[in-house]
């Protein structure tokens, strides 16, 4: 989110523009799920700039965020930059920022308890005897799923109403309404 880093990445946005856009989206679309990806350990990323990124993640509270350690790719502007960080530093920062986002994800999962949501049924898991689906906010195969049991009258690609009652760290558990 640091302006110097964004400029060196040749991004056409800056910190203020990004923050204003996100605030506008949150205010105008309160049920919107915010998702993004971030590179950590980019050349020139100081401790202070990394700390600023962590604070941005904490302030924004993305519903879902992915993080990738910077990798030096030939024929890119960053390939020729100075101040490349060590692999240890990149991995350490990657682990640290993932922990921050994981805590945010757990807080958001707790907020889901008791909510009634519409779920698109993706498949029946024969190993567990549960149906698995996702809501509008959940991306299949990437995010948490919603698991539930039914009497067998449900079909894949059907949209059903489910009340969330648990989160096991990888999926929500729900009751068909």
Describe each region flagged by the PLM.
Residues 1-64, 72-89:
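Conserved non-cysteine loop/helix-boundary elements of the Radical SAM core domain that shape
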Residues 80-177:
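Terminal RNA-binding accessory module
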């Amino acid at each position: 989110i640091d302006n110097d880093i964004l400029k060196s990445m040749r991004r056409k946005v800056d910190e203020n523009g990004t923050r204003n856009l996100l605030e506008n989206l949150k205010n105008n679309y309160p049920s919107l799920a915010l998702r993004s990806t971030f590179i950590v350990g980019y050349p020139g990323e100081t401790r202070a700039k990394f700390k600023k990124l962590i604070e941005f993640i904490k302030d924004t509270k993305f519903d879902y965020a992915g993080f990738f350690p910077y990798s030096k790719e030939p024929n890119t502007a960053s390939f020729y930059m100075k101040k490349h960080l060590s692999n240890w530093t990149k991995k350490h920062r990657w682990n640290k920022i993932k922990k921050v986002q994981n805590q945010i994800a757990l807080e958001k999962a707790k907020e889901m308890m008791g909510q009634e949501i519409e779920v698109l049924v993706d498949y029946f898991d024969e190993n567990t005897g549960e149906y698995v689906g996702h809501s509008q906010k959940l991306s299949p195969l990437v995010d948490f799923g919603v698991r539930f049991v039914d009497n067998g009258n449900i079909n894949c690609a059907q949209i059903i109403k489910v009340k969330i009652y648990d989160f096991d760290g990888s999926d929500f558990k729900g009751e068909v309404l």
